[in-house]
Amino acid sequence: MAKAPMRVAVTGAAGQIGYSLLFRIANGDLLGKDQPVILQLLEIPDEKAQKALTGVMMELEDCAFPLLAGMTAHSDPMTAFKDIDVALLVGARPRGPGMERKDLLSANAQIFTAQGKALNAVAKKTVKVLVVGNPANTNAYIAMKSAPDIPAKNFTAMLRLDHNRALSQLANKLNKPVADIEKLVVWGNHSPTMYPDYRFATIDGKSVKDSINDAAWNKDVFIPTVGKRGAAIIEARGLSSAASAANAAIDHIHDWVLGTNGKWVTMGIPSKGEYGIPAEVIYGFPVTCENGEYKMIEGLEIDEFSRERMTHTLNELLEEQAGVKHLLP
C-alpha cells in the first residue's frame, strides 16, 4: 500500500538554495524513494518573488515527479506551515552592504519569531525543523523560543555543510574515498568559528589523527580551510554555495528521519548541558539517528586545544543570543 504523503514546507523557495533543493525533495532524496511529498512553498509577499516561485513550480510540474503529490505557493507562514511534517527554513535576510552583524540579527529575529509562532500555531507538534538561513544556530534558537508547544529538540540548525566540507578535505588529504571516513565531529556555530575535530575519526578502521599526524596542518590549514570555505566559493563563483548547502540540508533531514545506521553525523541541536555547553544553546554536536530521533554521542574526551576552540565558538553564540534576547517573546 502506498504511503500517505508527508508535507514539507520550504521557505525562501524561489531562492538559489531553494532551486537546488526542491527538485531533489520531489525526486525522493529527502524522505525516501517510496515516500510521496506535498511541497508547501513560502516566499516573501513581493510580486517579483511570488512570480519567480510560480516559475519554479511550473518547472517542478514539468519534471512529472511520481512522488510529488501536490504543491502550494504561500506568502504567509500561517498557511505555508499548516499540518507540516518537515520545515526547511532556508529564507533569511542576507547581509547587505554596510550592514552590521547586529542589524542582520535583528532583521532575522523578526522573521524567525514570526515563523516560530506560525509553526507553534499550525504545524504538527511532531514537526522536524531545520534552519539553513544564517545565522542558522541563532535563527533556530529564536524559532524554538517562539514555539513553546513544540518540543525544543525538534529545532535544529544546519552544521552538515561544515561536516561534509571537513570530510572532503580529510579524504583529499588522505587520498581515500570520502565514504570511508567515520566519526568526524564539527562543534559549535555554523560560522567560521566552528571547530571540525577529527581526533576520533577513523578511515578503514584506522585513526585519521594518527594517519595525518600533523598538528600544524590541523591548526593552520584544515580548520581555516573548512571555516572559510563558504567565502572561498563566493570568491570563485561570484555567488554563495547553494547546491552544496541544499545537499547538506537533504543529508540532515534524510538521516534524522531515516537513520544513520550507527554512523556519526553533526547536527546543530539544543544543548542539555553536555560538554559544558549551556542548556538551550543550539550547538553543533556529534549524533547518531534512528527511528526519527537523534541521540548525542556523549563522553568524548575534550583536550585543551579542543576546549579552547569549543569555548571560542560558544562565546560567539552567546553573544548572538544576547543580541536578540530583547526581541524574543
From Swiss-Prot:
Cystine residue pairs: none
Entry keyword set: NAD, Oxidoreductase, Tricarboxylic acid cycle
Biological process annotations from GO: malate metabolic process; tricarboxylic acid cycle
Binding site for substrate: R95, R101, N134, R165
Record-annotated active site: H190 (proton acceptor)
GO MF, one annotated term: L-malate dehydrogenase (NAD+) activity
Domain of life: Bacteria
Protein family (similarity comment): Belongs to the LDH/MDH superfamily. MDH type 2 family.
NCBIfam families: MalateDH-SF1, PRK05442.1
Function in brief: Catalyzes the reversible oxidation of malate to oxaloacetate.
Name of the protein described by the UniProt record: Malate dehydrogenase
Source organism of this protein record: Polynucleobacter asymbioticus (strain DSM 18221 / CIP 109841 / QLW-P1DMWA-1) (Polynucleobacter necessarius subsp. asymbioticus)
Organismal lineage: Bacteria, Pseudomonadati, Pseudomonadota, Betaproteobacteria, Burkholderiales
Primary gene name: mdh
